Amino acid sequence: MHKNWLILFSLFFFAVNVFAAPKKYNVLFIISDDLTSTALSCYGNTVCKTPNIDALAARGTRFTRTYCQGTYCGPSRASFMSGYYPHATGVLGYKSPRPKIGNRSTWSQHFKNNGYHTARVSKIYHMGVPGGIEQGGHGADDAASWTERFNSQGPEWKAPGNTLSLIHI
């Protein structure tokens, strides 16, 4: 009798492990303009106090060896989000990589296509000030990448003076 229970018990645990859904990890990605790792206390800054970021870093994965593909945010972000170098995305200014990468997935789109809820707050694909973003609209975003988009209402500003883009050189 005990042998039958032991076999039944073993089969039950085998079945649970075989048919259990694979564990999905929670993924939180934070990106910020002009924020270097040296500005966060989890990377050793003793002046700035960032306890919430520190707590996330202590419980998750903290990257310590990353490289920037562009010298300013448009090409760098497009490269990071798509996995392609700026010259391959054609993003050398502030525009979306989508026209150049076509139907190839961004990493956020890959998460979305695999059952994750992907959300972003404010702009990710820096395309100047996307139309409607100041009123809380979606702007000119990459809709295929997000389940939910939220833009805080508020104006962006530009520093006074003239600028020169590499595109016009």
Question: Can you say where each PLM-predicted feature lies in the sequence?
Answer:
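Formylglycine-dependent sulfatase
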Residues: H2-K3, F19-I167
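Cleavable N-terminal signal peptides
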Residues: I7-L8, V18
